[in-house]
Design a protein with these regions (language model features):
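Conserved hydrophobic/aromatic beta-strand scaffold that supports enzyme active sites
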Residues: 1, 14-16, 124-126
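Short acidic-hydrophobic surface loop/beta-edge motif
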Residues: 1-8, 96-100
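Binuclear metal-dependent hydrolase catalytic cores centered on His/Asp/Glu-rich metal-binding motifs
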Residues: 4-48, 65-74
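Short, well-ordered beta-to-alpha junction loops that form the rim of enzyme active sites
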Residues: 19, 51-55, 91-92
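Short acidic, glycine-rich surface-loop motifs adjacent to enzyme active sites
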Residues: 44-61
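Conserved beta-sheet core of the metallophosphoesterase superfamily
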Residues: 60-135
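A short C-terminal boundary segment appended to hydrolase-like catalytic domains
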Residues: 129-175
Length: 175
């Protein structure tokens, strides 16, 4: 857990959690950790970020949907309840962005693995966060970048890039 001060003087709380289970593809946070998570986010902060390995919602284009954490519904409810703004994850190596219950859920690709899905190419996410917006950009090392989504934090409205839905097609390889 980190307490940081951002560029615009925003206070930031970042909590990272190990969701892995030995020898299993599925993950879990576990009810025994919920009170600890709640406590970490109890201090006032302008921005609250939660990071974990597994994703909390199924990722399109990844086949089997069994690789969310076992307690994903409870975890999403908890994170919404404690005012988390952003969840970061990446188990399936496929970038995607959702807005669920005022929580921006951002799944990342990978630049360090060859375990890619379909035509998804190596990438990582860049998040630019201000008091008004959260802009998510996919960066493709050495080959460019693509705007993924823009969250208006005042209206809590997500504006995803309509081309993102086609990222599983071969045409998505052009930045």
């Amino acid at each position: 857990m980190l307490h940081l001060t951002g560029r615009e003087g925003q206070t930031v709380t970042l909590v990272a959690m190990d969701s892995t289970k030995p020898d299993l593809a599925e993950g879990e946070i576990g009810r025994e950790r919920y009170s600890w998570i709640r406590q970490q986010f109890s201090a006032p902060a302008d921005l609250r970020i939660f990071a974990l390995h597994h994703h909390l919602v199924p990722v399109p284009g990844t086949g089997r949907e069994r690789n969310t954490v076992w307690d994903s519904g409870d975890v999403l409810a908890l994170l919404s309840d404690v005012g988390v703004n952003v969840v970061l994850s990446g188990h399936k190596h496929v970038p995607f962005v959702w807005l669920l219950n005022n929580v921006l859920v951002v799944n990342s690709g990978t630049v360090s693995s060859h375990r890619l899905r379909g035509y998804v190419r190596p990438s990582y996410n860049l998040l630019e966060i201000t008091r008004e917006r959260i802009v998510v950009t996919l960066r493709y090392p050495g080959t460019g970048e693509r705007h993924a989504a823009d969250l208006d934090r005042r209206e809590m409205r997500l504006y995803p890039n309509p081309d993102l839905a086609g990222m599983f097609a071969k045409s998505a390889w052009h930045a």
